[in-house]
Amino acid sequence: MSRILDNEMMGDEELVERTLRPQYLREYIGQDKVKDQLQIFIEAAKMRDEALDHVLLFGPPGLGKTTMAFVIANELGVNLKQTSGPVIEKAGDLVAILNDLEPGDVLFIDEIHRLPMSVEEVLYSAMEDFYIDIMIGAGEGSRSVHLELPPFTLIGATTRAGMLSNPLRARFGITGHMEYYAHADLTEIVERTADIFEMEITHEAASELALRSRGTPRIANRLLKRVRDFAQIMGNGVIDDVITDKALTMLDVDHEGLDYVDQKILRTMIEMYSGGPVGLGTLSVNIAEERETVEDMYEPYLIQKGFIMRTRSGRVATAKAYEHLGYEYSEK
């Protein structure tokens, strides 16, 4: 069974997110710092009748990077062509995409950190000077062809900005760090989703659901759907704070937004390693999860909420982690 708090896409969620997707910056809830900067850059580019500078959006999964890319294209009034790093396997795949762009278009590459180096190198001249040089043929009969491209905007999205090469990162003129959502913003998102799907929800229930959604809209919308099921079967169809708490408790989502995997990580650190420090590889083996999964999916939220600290010697469980799980804490 999939983890209810997984911030990667599940099942029909891509369709759901498209339904919920705002069209313009004024409709986009949260990420105010990124929005305010983009508003200025977009308006300036439109006034000069130029393509917007290339944009890099980075941050944990589920925070709206793809949505922001679509909003940028809508604000510019241009087409958006979407692909992802793993899909572009060779330089020829990228050349075909670039050759299909119209002036001012947005090319959105999700998981851009997963582009093969041979593909990435083609992007350098395309991003900087809007041209590519491609080789036609093989052996002695091969020749180089210079292909001019129309001005375009590349929007790259990544959950692992540190994996981008320096030459690629340097070619993005605009960077936006997508952060976990504030409680008030996430509450508003829950209420907006409920309204779109004609669910009856109290403000208190929306607030509680937002509190336990790890600052992530994708998780909040997923939990809202599950709580609605509980409200229909165990209540009168109205999503109130009582049914919300009962549903989320049954789903093993506690009041800090931690599920059984998060708690397993913390309990392992406390019970087996006296709170740490413990290496990420060792910890991953003990909880039977891939190292990358722990690092990308679980650890960022646990650090952001103050349950774990990173040190040079490894990960350390904080006093807050001990208190949350009911362990006695003593200074080392």
Curated annotation (Swiss-Prot):
Chain residue ranges for the region called Head domain (RuvB-H):
255-332
Keywords, sorted A to Z: ATP-binding, Cytoplasm, DNA damage, DNA recombination, DNA repair, DNA-binding, Hydrolase, Nucleotide-binding
Subcellular localization is given as:
Cytoplasm
Q: Which Pfam families match?
A: AAA_lid_4, RuvB_C, RuvB_N
Q: Which residues bind DNA?
A: R291, R310, R312, R315
Single biological process term from Gene Ontology? DNA recombination
SUPFAM superfamilies cross-referenced by the UniProt entry: P-loop containing nucleoside triphosphate hydrolases, Winged helix' DNA-binding domain
InterPro entries reported in the protein's UniProt record: AAA+_ATPase, AAA_lid_4, DNA_helicase_Holl-junc_RuvB, P-loop_NTPase, RuvB-like_N, RuvB_C, WH-like_DNA-bd_sf, WH_DNA-bd_sf
The top EC class, named as a word, is: hydrolase
**Its domain of life?**
Bacteria
Membrane spanning residue stretches: none
Q: What GO cellular component term, any one, is given?
A: Holliday junction resolvase complex
Q: Where is this region: Large ATPase domain (RuvB-L)?
A: 1-181
Residues annotated as binding ATP: L20, R21, G62, K65, T66, T67, E128, D129, F130, R171, Y181, R218
Primary place of residence?
Answer: cytoplasm
How would you summarize the oligomeric state and partners of this protein? Homohexamer. Forms an RuvA(8)-RuvB(12)-Holliday junction (HJ) complex. HJ DNA is sandwiched between 2 RuvA tetramers; dsDNA enters through RuvA and exits via RuvB. An RuvB hexamer assembles on each DNA strand where it exits the tetramer. Each RuvB hexamer is contacted by two RuvA subunits (via domain III) on 2 adjacent RuvB subunits; this complex drives branch migration. In the full resolvosome a probable DNA-RuvA(4)-RuvB(12)-RuvC(2) complex forms which resolves the HJ.
Q: Which HAMAP family match?
A: DNA_HJ_migration_RuvB
The text of the family note is:
Belongs to the RuvB family.
Q: What does this protein do?
A: The RuvA-RuvB-RuvC complex processes Holliday junction (HJ) DNA during genetic recombination and DNA repair, while the RuvA-RuvB complex plays an important role in the rescue of blocked DNA replication forks via replication fork reversal (RFR). RuvA specifically binds to HJ cruciform DNA, conferring on it an open structure. The RuvB hexamer acts as an ATP-dependent pump, pulling dsDNA into and through the RuvAB complex. RuvB forms 2 homohexamers on either side of HJ DNA bound by 1 or 2 RuvA tetramers; 4 subunits per hexamer contact DNA at a time.
What UniProt notes about the protein's domains is: Has 3 domains, the large (RuvB-L) and small ATPase (RuvB-S) domains and the C-terminal head (RuvB-H) domain. The head domain binds DNA, while the ATPase domains jointly bind ATP, ADP or are empty depending on the state of the subunit in the translocation cycle. During a single DNA translocation step the structure of each domain remains the same, but their relative positions change.
Q: What is this protein called?
A: Holliday junction branch migration complex subunit RuvB
Annotated organism of origin: Streptococcus pneumoniae serotype 4 (strain ATCC BAA-334 / TIGR4)
Its lineage reads: Bacteria, Bacillati, Bacillota, Bacilli, Lactobacillales
